[in-house]
């Protein structure tokens, strides 16, 4: 089968690999759509480690990685599989790990408890982002009862735009989207944000100062944006983005009653929470897909992400 592999910084090839063998508890999925996780794709493509570990990344990257957000059709099931049948439309819920083969491939084999069925009304392009929504779910749930509250999202890239949808779905009275790119703020409004704030302007910061947030999800991955969240939230800040740069705490933050959570593990309850939203039609990730390209144009797609000309890119194996 055809698999995309990053061989070195800014160099990739389509390599041939055997179709995965299906274990008893696994399903074999023919991949129909695979969307980028921009931070991970950009860092591996440019020779930077997303977690800032010494000696990483190590090339060549395992074939198919960092692809981990995919959807497709079940074409084979293991002997112990009970919840799926061939022909089911599914998406992955969990990545395969950084040292394992990734999902930029024609076929992937996954344990049945790490995939979910897609409702008929959900496209492959939208369903491929289920893994990202599953990652967001524990952060949104950790914020607690948001009914009637003013809640923020810093950084409205793909995760931030989904967070806007999720916060609105759980009943936040005001969902404030914050970014420095006007075009991203416009997308956030279309995704359900009740207010948008350009945090790169004095006027934007003044607006937050005048009306602080009661909770916030940081999806930026930037120290400066996290600082904005910390400075203007009187409650819990859930840090979803992998942070690069620094943010500082002071006595003022202590007096605000600020709480911070990071890197939350997912539970079955988180997944159920997210899938219920999907089934109710409250999550739509298709609007996040800015370009659709074959594997052969991977370099072009990642450059769109680097240049901020795309939110997510959907790649097709054939």
Give the role of each language-model region.
Residues 42-50:
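Short Gly/aromatic-enriched secondary-structure transition segments
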Residues 223-282, 317-318:
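Glycine-rich phosphate-binding loop and adjacent beta-alpha segment
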Residues 123-201:
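Mid-domain Rossmann-like dinucleotide-binding core that forms the NAD(H)/NADP(H) cofactor-binding site
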Residues 201-211:
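Short amphipathic alpha-helix with an adjacent loop that forms part of the alpha/beta core around
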Residues 20-35, 49-96:
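Glycine-rich beta-strand-centered segment in the early N-terminal region that forms part
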Residues 91, 217, 238:
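N-terminal Rossmann-like NAD(P) cofactor-binding module of classical short-chain dehydrogenase/reductase
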Residues 3, 268-318:
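C-terminal hydrophobic helical "lid"/dimerization subdomain
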Residues 56-63, 68, 83, 92-154:
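NAD(P)H dinucleotide-binding glycine-rich loop of Rossmann-like/cofactor-binding domains
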């Amino acid at each position: 089968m055809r698999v995309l592999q990053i061989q070195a910084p800014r160099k990739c090839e389509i390599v041939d690999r055997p179709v995965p063998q299906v274990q008893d508890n696994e399903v074999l999925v023919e991949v129909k759509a695979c969307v980028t996780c921009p931070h991970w794709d950009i860092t591996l493509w440019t020779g930077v480690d997303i977690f800032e570990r010494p000696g990483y990344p190590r090339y060549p990257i395992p074939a198919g990685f960092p692809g981990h957000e995919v959807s497709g059709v079940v074409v084979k099931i293991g002997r112990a599989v009970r919840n799926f049948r061939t022909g089911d439309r599914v998406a992955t819920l969990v990545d395969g790990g950084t040292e394992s083969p990734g999902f930029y491939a024609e076929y992937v084999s996954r344990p049945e408890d790490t995939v979910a069925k897609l409702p008929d009304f959900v496209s492959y392009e939208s369903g491929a982002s289920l893994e990202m929504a599953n990652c967001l779910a524990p952060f949104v749930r950790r914020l607690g009862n948001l009914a009637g509250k003013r809640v923020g999202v810093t950084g409205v890239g793909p995760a931030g735009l989904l967070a806007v949808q999720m916060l609105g779905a759980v009943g936040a009275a005001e969902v404030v989207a914050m970014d420095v790119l006007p075009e991203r703020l416009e997308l956030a409004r279309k995704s359900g944000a009740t207010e948008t704030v350009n945090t790169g302007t004095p006027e934007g910061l003044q607006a937050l100062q005048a009306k602080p947030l009661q909770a916030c999800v940081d999806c930026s991955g930037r120290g400066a944006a996290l600082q904005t969240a910390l400075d203007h939230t009187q409650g819990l800040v859930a840090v979803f983005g992998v942070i690069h740069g620094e943010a500082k705490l002071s006595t003022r933050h202590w007096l605000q009653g600020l709480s911070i959570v990071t890197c939350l593990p997912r539970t079955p309850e988180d997944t159920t929470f997210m899938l219920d939203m999907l089934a109710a039609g409250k999550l739509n990730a298709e609007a996040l897909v800015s370009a659709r390209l074959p594997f052969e144009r991977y370099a072009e797609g990642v450059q769109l992400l680097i240049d901020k000309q795309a939110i997510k890119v959907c790649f097709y194996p054939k």
